[in-house]
Amino acid sequence: MTTLAIDIGGTKLAAALIGADGQIRDRRELPTPASQTPQALRDALAALVAPLQAHAQQVAIASTGIIRDGSLLALNPHNLGGLLHFPLVKTLEQLSNLPTIAINDAQAAAWAEYQALEGDITDMVFITVSTGVGGGVVSGGKLLTGPSGLAGHIGHTLADPHGPVCGCGRTGCVEAIASGRGIAAAAQGELMGADARTIFTRAGQGDEQAQQLIHRSAHVLARLIADIKATTDCQCVVVGGSVGLAEGYLALVKTYLAQEPAAFHVDLLAAHYRHDAGLLGAALLAQGEKL
């Protein structure tokens, strides 16, 4: 059975056909609409899936935000241009005339990355550092979603009680500091207004402020990972996302994690499926892998 997998992120929308063999075909991308109107997202999704839907038997959506009863509920609306709510499953069933499931994107990615691990691993955590910071938890070989879909939203745990206000309404969240949006928001002087990609480029060129911003992000993430180890006793943490996979970033996180007491150390791995983990995880779940 072929699955039309869709990944809805804060920066881009992606779609692909994924067969039972896990192979990705006909991958396509569009920018995520920076609009508070549901119609803008619906129109973008319609354009994305139209060339693919005739070749699939089902649809699987991996989306940022809390997924509850088939709908997207934005924990941080800024990540989707201010959009608060969107009926994912209903919309895609109308657009494609195919049975549809939806799951949080980091939860989906966690499931795909768990399947790729070697050895006797039953407990792992996936962290994506991108526009926002999200996560997925596998415990005892089972993906945790929680009764309301909130499980794994580790980007909204506390990093600094005196830090910036997060889009979720809390103060000092990990996401508000460590994410691509958080890195960019903290930039000053000649870097003010630059996006995270530009800041990473400038850091590679020796810009001191850019390097400090990236170190700050990596340090916050390392402390989060130590907290996760204390909470879950996971055997490994897999890091993905555009920031998480940026050159040199994971090495920085490892350096800061090594400064924590040994009890909180855990193996850190780069995402095996890189930017396709959400698509693959959603397809796996739609094709019969159990939560």
UniProtKB/Swiss-Prot annotation:
It is an enzyme of class 2 (transferase). Belongs to the ROK (NagC/XylR) family. NanK subfamily. Its EC number is 2.7.1.60. Zn(2+) binds at residues 156, 166, 168, 173. InterPro entries: ATPase_NBD, ManNAc_kinase_bac, ROK, ROK_cs. It catalyses: an N-acyl-D-mannosamine + ATP = an N-acyl-D-mannosamine 6-phosphate + ADP + H(+). ATP binds at residues 5-12, 132-139. Homodimer. Catalyzes the phosphorylation of N-acetylmannosamine (ManNAc) to ManNAc-6-P. CDD domains: ASKHA_NBD_ROK_EcNanK-like. Pathway: Amino-sugar metabolism; N-acetylneuraminate degradation; D-fructose 6-phosphate from N-acetylneuraminate: step 2/5. Keywords: ATP-binding, Carbohydrate metabolism, Kinase, Metal-binding, Nucleotide-binding, Transferase, Zinc. One of its GO terms (molecular function) is zinc ion binding. GO terms for biological process: N-acetylneuraminate catabolic process. This is N-acetylmannosamine kinase. It comes from Shigella boydii serotype 18 (strain CDC 3083-94 / BS512).
